[in-house]
Amino acid sequence: MFIGRKTELESLSSAFATSRASISVVFGRRRVGKSSLIERAGRGTKFFAFEGLENQPQSAQKKIFIEQLRAQGCAVSSARNQSWYELLSNLRLLINPTEVTVILLDELQWLANYRSELISALKLVWDQILSKHSNLKLVLCGSVASFMVRKVIRSRALYGRCDLTLNLQPFKLAEAKEMLPGKLHEETLLAYLLVGGIPKYLSLLTDKDSVLRSLAFHCQGINAYFSSEYQRIFLSHFGDNPHYEKVARFLCGKSYGANRSEIVENLSLPNSGQLTEILENLEYAGVIHSFVPFTEKSSSRTKRFHLVDNFIRFYLTFLEPLVLGGALERTDFLSQVFNTPKMSSWLGISFELTCLNHISEIAQVLGFAAVRYQAGPYFRHGSTSEGDGAQLDLVYKRGDMVCTVCEVKYQNGPIGISVAKRLDEAISKVKELKNKTVQKVLIGKDPTSNKLEDGVNFSRVLSIDEIM
């Protein structure tokens, strides 16, 4: 069953329905569902797929490309030392003159060995041969966002030739709910907090009668999926560059994120273009996300970076210590991992990050989605020249002169009146809010006490299931 991706599916289907040849580019992190989306949009067409090999030399890539051409009906030469121009020219043999023909080049970064040679050859083949066939719809797909952006989308070779670009994101809560049919709201939310919105991960959490038992099953054992997925993520996205993992590990321990200067200082990295590239690539891959405080204008200096990949956070905090200690297989997950104060605290942070991942959905429920806004968390260290420290979970600086300040609480049972008092105190420390109309909103997972529901302390009490 195909779930979600309505907007992306419509965009890709429209690209396939055009009356001329077109190039679409689809990228996103591994296991996010790129190939499934393309195959779904290509239903009813003549569909041909080619895929690169991970960590193989150019000779192996060309050999497998020839084999895939032959497997799909092309009688092509197997001569050695053929150029990419010669090999890609064979794609014309697949084009049906009377039917829409979709050709997918999947895991393009592997097929190209992360170099520009294939892309340059593709430009010539496209201009001289493929673009002449109006029924052809070429899709370039990859899981290494940095390559897809820099070598494909922004390349001089394909400049102005890409008709559609899709950066496929993990599922939101509403789609995760569809992935877990029959699960109650609270269990669906727990699954999302633990592994995020990656479709493959969510599908594994349906193997047992509960999300927690399914997760434990896929974490324990030598061949357990989740116990080795962390290494696969960093190897497939970032190769053997250790700085990517260092940044992720550092941010994992920062509940309020960190700015560029703090990353440089703590990791002893040069404050250079290399760091800019590392941060951009991590953000392209959905591992981290940057927010600019509503009090500042956007710049690299004011951005705060947060580790927003829930699975990576879960692995580094809970799984890795067990793996390194050799205790993974003999650990009772329910009692030693899940039912612990450390997990409760961790889930609270994960809930805050999940709300940051649903900024537009929250704005929609609150009724101001049509208003221009800048949104994100706010954090200021204590005892600075600007005043005492302050932290706000989520702030919308709206174009209608209102600031919506959200307090996010992941808590079992009623939320006490003290929450409202702490928020008032935090707001009073932010001078930029003193002359603003402030709308206070409480976002929680459980019913709150009557005192908080009466509208005196908060103008709106929002339950997370309202955006599911």
What is each residue range found by the language model?
Residues F294, K303-M468:
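A cross-kingdom feature that marks ATP-driven nucleic-acid transaction machinery
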Residues M1-V337:
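Phosphate-binding site recognition
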